């Protein structure tokens, strides 16, 4: 059957044909600019390409003006180890000895609300392909998840599906899930956040970039066939113009096949090893429209594509549909003519569908044909790189001052408060979630479950490895976006440092409400400045990132949620520092590093006590978040690198010292006796304040003096606050509670809520 296409010839002959550009997310002035670029109206296929590539997701048109600050602040020394940075599929860091590590975090928020399982699964698949496109082997994934209240009916629909999608896709790929975070808050009702992180390794010489160069070189599409799934994933594709009157539902959520991706990974690695790949791009958001325009725009010529050669799995697809499809597990590569057959042989070996769909040309135009007719003829750079950049209004919200007025917190008996905290949805066990993930597949996972950071061995001979952590606090960030983002950076940095790894690079995923809201844009700008300035203070670069806007339900935006990931390198993973206390014959001494202040703004105790008092809508959020001096984080990192006097270490964050002590003891059941008077004059502050730059460490009695001396040398405040005991009790300020009692309360909450979740993973109506 011949499909009706709107051709370039028809566009010139029918200049005033009405087009559904508003339905596709384009504004009047944007559409007018497209007509100006082309000198005519766009064809349906061209309109599709511009609409998806000029979408917020692909073009960063509302955030780009602020994201430039990362480049403006990065020093030459910081950038010296970056092999690929902001603007590439993923950041790549040179870690020495000819080796490199690449990592990135990406959002898949809206699809995961519509269809939780597939939305989350394809989020994992997409970030893995970003890593593959850099020439790397993916070695691990992590996730940052945000949902509405744990007891809300919609959370019971969304959470099991999201977790199932992540676990199914990651487990089938054979990639260990080495850590993550799950947070519940009213602001995420109707708009969950699903941020997936992937890390990969490669040789420096094997780095691949997304560009098409060399006139006459061939464009190869390989992987799964192209279908109707995912159309409209990054913009709105809802016009009958593109369907020629046919009545069919075009699902905006992609459908993933992890086994196809697993084979695609191995196929890519063999292609890289063969040395025949000139440039490569994965097909994710905006599909072939993105891959072809970006490859051509980044190269030294133009490109011609024949859509008749694209392997399809649906009949009668129009050119617009083929270009906008976000069918998963696809890659696009550029190879020299003499290597086409070798390319096809390798794909055939892995049973991967492959087709030659075009070639690199002279000039700067992207020309696309379908059924013998030209349906796209446009400068590639205008599609990929020249979306309008908006300097949207931003202003400090009128309500910010009132929000920052601290109203105090109710103080209760220490053990009573501690049990409430560990049993709360905010801090209770996530085993219900994490036990669905394979954490040790491939055999290189050193730390993951309940650890400060995921630790992986990357060299079996030397024991060299990496540590990765990702953190965020929407509560802190709403109170003070700049400081809240710095706190997320500080915690991720500290989590990596306490393993004994040296932090070397940063990635991020910035999740916010509508950029058309000046309040939101102020939050976003403050966060960008906090992260960029913080990176300079720590002396490590931001290697890449992602922005997700329009996260809101109605007019109510989510908590501003900057997810910050930090990568560290450790010389010998066998010497990495764990975070759990064991049962040993001789008591271990507990030392608190860092200074404790009366800081409860945005704290978990503030949230839990507010809910207890019936202030659920407010979540008790008020005051200023803890203040962080990133120089203190650097001193802590110096303390831990190469420190063999520490037997266990755990950073202090949500819930403060008491929660950290429980987390260190819960697995073994060992008792702890803590003298809170050494921490702060107020026992409640000592137990539950969330002051930054603090770590609880354990050491043997004969190494205490050495440890304290090293702390002094590094400029880190340190004080002995207690020791382990054999009575199984956690003793705090004259009160005590059994560790086993706390563990039972901690373990019961989520299974009780989700053990029989009705309607889990059902598609939203």
UniProtKB/Swiss-Prot annotation:
InterPro entries: PRibForGlyAmidine_synth_PurL, PurL_linker, PurM-like_C_dom, PurM-like_C_sf, PurM-like_N, PurM-like_N_sf. It is found in: Cytoplasm. It comes from the Bacteria. GO terms for cellular component: cytoplasm. One of its GO terms (biological process) is 'de novo' IMP biosynthetic process. Mg(2+) 2 binds at residues 130, 282. CDD domains: PurL_repeat1, PurL_repeat2. Keywords: ATP-binding, Cytoplasm, Ligase, Magnesium, Metal-binding, Nucleotide-binding, Purine biosynthesis. Coiled coil: none annotated. Its EC number is 6.3.5.3. ATP binds at residues 60, 104, 508, 545. The active site is at 57, 108 (proton acceptor). Pathway: Purine metabolism; IMP biosynthesis via de novo pathway; 5-amino-1-(5-phospho-D-ribosyl)imidazole from N(2)-formyl-N(1)-(5-phospho-D-ribosyl)glycinamide: step 1/2. Pfam families: AIRS (PF00586), AIRS_C (PF02769), FGAR-AT_linker (PF18072). GO terms for molecular function: ATP binding; magnesium ion binding; phosphoribosylformylglycinamidine synthase activity. Mg(2+) 1 binds at residues 106, 546. Substrate binds at residues 107-110, 129, 254, 326-328, 548. Its main location: cytoplasm. It catalyses: N(2)-formyl-N(1)-(5-phospho-beta-D-ribosyl)glycinamide + L-glutamine + ATP + H2O = 2-formamido-N(1)-(5-O-phospho-beta-D-ribosyl)acetamidine + L-glutamate + ADP + phosphate + H(+). Part of the phosphoribosylformylglycinamidine synthase complex involved in the purines biosynthetic pathway. Catalyzes the ATP-dependent conversion of formylglycinamide ribonucleotide (FGAR) and glutamine to yield formylglycinamidine ribonucleotide (FGAM) and glutamate. The FGAM synthase complex is composed of three subunits. PurQ produces an ammonia molecule by converting glutamine to glutamate. PurL transfers the ammonia molecule to FGAR to form FGAM in an ATP-dependent manner. NCBIfam families: FGAM_synth_II, PRK01213.1. Monomer. Part of the FGAM synthase complex composed of 1 PurL, 1 PurQ and 2 PurS subunits. Belongs to the FGAMS family. HAMAP family: PurL_2. This is Phosphoribosylformylglycinamidine synthase subunit PurL. It comes from Corynebacterium aurimucosum (strain ATCC 700975 / DSM 44827 / CIP 107346 / CN-1). The gene is purL.
């Amino acid at each position: 059957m011949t499909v009706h296409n709107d051709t370039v010839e028809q566009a010139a002959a029918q200049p005033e044909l009405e087009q559904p550009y508003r339905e596709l997310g384009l504004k009047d002035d944007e559409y007018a600019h497209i007509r100006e670029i082309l000198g005519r109206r766009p064809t349906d296929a061209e309109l599709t390409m511009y609409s998806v590539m000029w979408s917020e997701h692909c073009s960063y048109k509302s955030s780009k003006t602020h994201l430039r600050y990362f480049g403006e602040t990065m020093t030459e020394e910081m950038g010296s180890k970056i092999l690929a940075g902001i603007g590439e599929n993923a950041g790549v860091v040179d870690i020495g000895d000819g080796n490199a590590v690449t990592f990135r975090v990406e959002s898949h928020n809206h699809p995961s609300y519509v269809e939780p399982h597939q939305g989350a699964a394809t989020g994992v698949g997409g970030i893995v392909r970003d890593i593959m496109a850099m020439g790397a082997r993916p070695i691990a994934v992590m996730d940052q998840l945000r949902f509405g209240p744990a007891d809300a009916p919609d959370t019971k629909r969304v959470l099991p599906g999201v977790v199932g999608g992540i676990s199914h896709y990651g487990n089938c790929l054979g990639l260990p899930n080495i850590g993550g975070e799950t947070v519940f808050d009213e602001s995420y009702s109707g708009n969950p956040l699903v941020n997936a992180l992937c890390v990969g390794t490669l040789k420096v010489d094997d780095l691949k970039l997304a560009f098409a160069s060399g006139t006459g070189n061939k464009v190869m599409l390989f992987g799964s066939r192209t279908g109707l799934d995912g159309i409209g994933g990054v913009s709105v594709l809802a016009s009958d113009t593109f369907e020629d009157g046919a009545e069919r539902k075009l699902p905006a959520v992609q459908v993933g096949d992890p086994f196809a991706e697993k084979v695609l990974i191995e196929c890519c690695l063999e292609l890289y090893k063969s040395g025949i790949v000139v440039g490569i791009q994965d097909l994710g958001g905006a599909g072939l429209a993105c891959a072809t325009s970006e490859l051509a725009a980044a190269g030294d010529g133009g490109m011609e594509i024949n859509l008749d050669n694209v392997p399809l799995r649906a009949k009668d697809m129009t050119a617009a549909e083929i270009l906008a499809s976000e069918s998963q597990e696809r890659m696009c590569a550029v190879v020299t003519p003499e290597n086409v057959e070798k390319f096809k042989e390798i794909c055939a070996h892995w049973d991967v569908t492959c087709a030659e769909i075009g070639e690199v040309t002279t000039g700067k135009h992207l020309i696309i044909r379908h059924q013998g007719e030209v349906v796209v003829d446009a400068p590639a750079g205008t599609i990929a790189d020249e979306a309008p950049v908006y300097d949207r209004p931003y202003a400090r919200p009128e309500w910010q001052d009132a929000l920052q007025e601290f109203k105090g917190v109710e103080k209760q008996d220490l053990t009573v408060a501690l049990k409430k905290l560990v049993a709360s949805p905010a801090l209770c066990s996530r085993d219900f979630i994490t036990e669905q993930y394979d954490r040790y597949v491939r055999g290189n996972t050193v730390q993951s479950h309940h650890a400060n950071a995921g630790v992986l061995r990357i060299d079996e001979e030397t024991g060299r490895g990496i540590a990765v952590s990702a953190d965020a606090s929407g509560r802190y960030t709403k109170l003070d976006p700049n400081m809240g983002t710095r706190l997320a950076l500080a915690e991720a940095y500290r989590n990596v440092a306490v393993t004994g790894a040296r932090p070397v690079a940063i990635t991020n995923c910035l999740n916010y409400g509508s950029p058309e809201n000046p309040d939101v844009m102020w939050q976003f700008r403050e966060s960008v400045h906090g992260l960029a300035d913080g990176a300079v203070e720590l002396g490590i670069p931001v290697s890449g990132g992602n922005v997700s806007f329009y996260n809101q339900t109605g007019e109510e935006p989510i908590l501003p949620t900057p997810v910050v990931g930090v990568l560290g390198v450790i010389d010998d993973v066998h010497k990495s520092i764990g975070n759990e206390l064991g049962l040993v014959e001789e008591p271990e001494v507990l030392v608190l590093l860092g200074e404790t202040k009366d800081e409860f703004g945005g704290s978990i105790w503030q949230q839990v006590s507010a809910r207890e008092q019936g202030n659920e809508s407010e979540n008790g959020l008020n005051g200023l978040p803890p203040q962080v001096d990133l120089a203190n984080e650097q001193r802590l990192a110096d303390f831990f690198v190469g420190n063999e006097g520490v037997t266990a270490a755990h950073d202090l964050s949500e819930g403060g010292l008491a929660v950290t002590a429980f987390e260190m003891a819960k697995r073994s059941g060992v008792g702890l006796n803590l003298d809170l008077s050494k921490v702060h004059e107020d026992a409640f502050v000592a137990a539950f304040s969330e002051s930054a730059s603090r770590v609880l460490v354990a050491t043997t009695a004969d190494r205490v003096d050495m440890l304290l001396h090293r702390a002094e040398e590094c400029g880190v405040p340190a004080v002995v606050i207690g020791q382990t005991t054999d009575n199984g009790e956690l003793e705090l300020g004259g009160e005590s509670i059994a560790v086993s009692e706390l563990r039972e309360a901690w373990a019961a909450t989520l299974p009780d809520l989700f053990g029989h979740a009705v309607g889990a993973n059902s598609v939203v109506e």
